[in-house]
From Swiss-Prot:
Annotated segments matching region G5: 158-160
Gene encoding the protein: era
Organism: Actinobacillus pleuropneumoniae serotype 5b (strain L20)
Keyword tags: Cell inner membrane, Cell membrane, Cytoplasm, GTP-binding, Membrane, Nucleotide-binding, Ribosome biogenesis, RNA-binding, rRNA-binding
Entry superkingdom: Bacteria
Position of the signal peptide: none
Cell compartment(s), UniProt: Cytoplasm; Cell inner membrane
Function: An essential GTPase that binds both GDP and GTP, with rapid nucleotide exchange. Plays a role in 16S rRNA processing and 30S ribosomal subunit biogenesis and possibly also in cell cycle regulation and energy metabolism.
GO cellular-component term (any): plasma membrane
Protein name from the UniProt record: GTPase Era
Family: Belongs to the TRAFAC class TrmE-Era-EngA-EngB-Septin-like GTPase superfamily. Era GTPase family.
Membrane topology per record: Peripheral membrane protein
Gene Ontology biological process terms, A to Z: ribosomal small subunit assembly
UniProt keyword annotation of Hydrolase present: no
NCBIfam families listed in its UniProt record: era, PRK00089.1, small_GTP
Amino acid sequence: MTEQNQQPKTYCGFIAIVGRPNVGKSTLLNKILGQKISITSRKAQTTRHRIVGIHTEDQYQAIYVDTPGLHIEEKRAINRLMNRAASSAIGDVDLIIFVVEGTKWTDDDEMVLNKLRSAKAPVVLAINKVDNIKEKDELLPHITELSQKFDFAEILPISAQRGKNVHILQKIVRKSLREGVHHFPEEYVTDRSQRFMASEIIREKLMRFTGEELPYSVTVEIEQFKLNERGTYEINGLILVEREGQKKMVIGAKGQKIKTIGMEARADMERLFDNKVHLELWVKVKAGWADDERALRSLGYMDE
């Protein structure tokens, strides 16, 4: 075989992104991928599922696992399941990116770190939101202190929101990839279905427009997702809440809040799907769904 006919070597690997809730894991994944795949909002616990983001560049393919935030409280069924999903994500990967927030270090951060002590893969500590640190001279002593807690492969200050040092993080990721075939075609950015992405977009808008008023125990079920004869996606979304008061909160005065949520979600879907979308939303009270593992199974939060 001549040198011209030889195929270039390809590299592929799995990368887990872990950390306590609300440190910017989803924002980081979206920045790496160049588009919104994982739900982001200011409310903790907005990532429910292990969303796989796929970044292929030249001969390198990195498959990112965006975990729910590991956290200490496990009183509700949904919390236990989210912790289980996050813990399983770190079991069989080539690199772990542990995201923390600025100079903050909490009991939850310590708990995540303790879970990482048994991990086989190298761990990169990504100190996110460094642009928000008011006293910049506090960062270096904080890095020194963290470096004594664990044998990190790298410690890198970043700003996922602004993209600061994200390219350096991607170089570190590349070095961790093993020689092997790519698992996905080059154009893939996620293995999730359009139906799933539609539910995530609606849920993000719910979190964004209800602020801290609405608990994270709200979910979206896509009851219909079809392409009509005019080439438009017809999507019907059912928003499940636990109490009547939450239903009123989502609908808003004279239906204005749910109208805004629907308009914003539709615009995001049209950008993501590159297609016209007709979206209809309903709100239903289903008491105790976040405490019921059977209900969680039916909504796709756990494997059968």
